[in-house]
Amino acid sequence: MSASGVAGLVQGLAVVLFGALLGGLLGGVVGAVIGVVVLGLFAIPYGRAVAHGEMYAGDALGIWRCVLDATWSVPNTAAGAIYYGVHRLTGNTHDVTRTKGSGAIWLVKGVVTKYATTIGTVKAGSNEYIDEHEMIHVFQARLFGPLYLIGVGLNYVVATILPYWLLFKNRRKITGFGSYFEDGVYPNVWNELWA
């Protein structure tokens, strides 16, 4: 088996084991079985994408990323596996060339036309102009591990209910309900300000 095949197997197994752990914590043995089955359905195509796309470079950094994604950052990896699976079911294409050695899976189309979205190690809709920004989100997930998605979610809630960003001098103008989120909340949550 090739090194990328091993990486794909490791990532897929990590997602399944995370499903067992999360399911077991929430629902005992039955929950663990459900977690294995549900996340297993996403782990298989995700692991294949990691292997086929040769996502991890064969150097020390690539190995370190693979280890982090299978351990400390496994909640983000599992969320990314689900995200990848849903995108593939809706016809999105895996760009294998751009994935190779990048440390992230590159999907061609985004969720929303003019935006890229990254969950875990899966980037949807990125391009050469904004890819550095999206890779910062992948880095943030690896750095903060199990705290990352919770921190991002909580910051979105706080920024929506308590719009602290209205105090910023260089903020975008709010022109309506949609603009409140697109021009107010979204660009002013911590992970976007950093990226």
Protein language model annotation of sequence segments:
Residues 49-61:
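Transmembrane alpha-helical segments that serve as helix-helix packing and pore/cofactor-lining elements
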Residues 36, 44, 90-96:
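A generic short-segment signal for beta-strand/edge and adjacent turn/coil regions
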Residues 1-52:
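Transmembrane alpha-helices
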Residues 100-129, 141:
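Active-site scaffold of zinc-dependent metalloenzymes
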Residues 2-16, 20, 60-88, 92, ...:
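Metalloprotease/metallohydrolase-associated module, dominated by Zn2+-dependent proteases
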Residues 135-154:
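Catalytic Zn2+-binding segment of zinc metalloproteases
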